[in-house]
A protein has these predicted regions:
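Charge-dense, helix-prone N-terminal extensions
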Residues: 1-115
Length: 115
């Protein structure tokens, strides 16, 4: 899956906004961020072809050990809640599943708070 296909997939999840919130920072113009309920569920580095998504803490060790293309996130992210994904090596279906999972985690958390 290429970057544009991935972007389209994220937007297809519904109620998703995309922004370049770091565009004024050096190198920040290549970091596309996807939001649901006003909160981030995915960071996509357009230059590096990598993605960072939220994940359940109990799933992270197994994914890191067994899933090709899943790696620790950049040092800016908590390894307790986030995983890195290499778009060039991950299986497309796993990429979609992990992205939807991140979307659902964030949406579920913040939809409850709005009620």
């Amino acid at each position: 899956m290429n970057i544009e296909e991935y972007r389209e997939y994220c937007l297809s999840l519904g109620e998703v906004e995309e922004k370049l919130p770091f565009a004024k920072m050096p190198g920040g113009d290549t970091l596309l961020v996807f939001y649901v309920c006003g909160h981030t569920f995915c960071y996509c580095d357009l230059h590096e072809f990598t993605v960072v998504v939220k994940c359940q803490t109990e799933r992270i060790p197994e994914l890191l050990a067994t899933a090709e293309g899943v790696e620790p996130p950049d040092s800016h992210f908590s390894t307790k809640y986030w995983i890195g994904i290499n778009l060039q090596t991950i299986d497309t279906e796993l990429l979609k599943e992990l992205t939807r999972n991140s979307f659902e985690i964030v949406k579920g958390k913040y939809e409850r708070k709005r009620k």
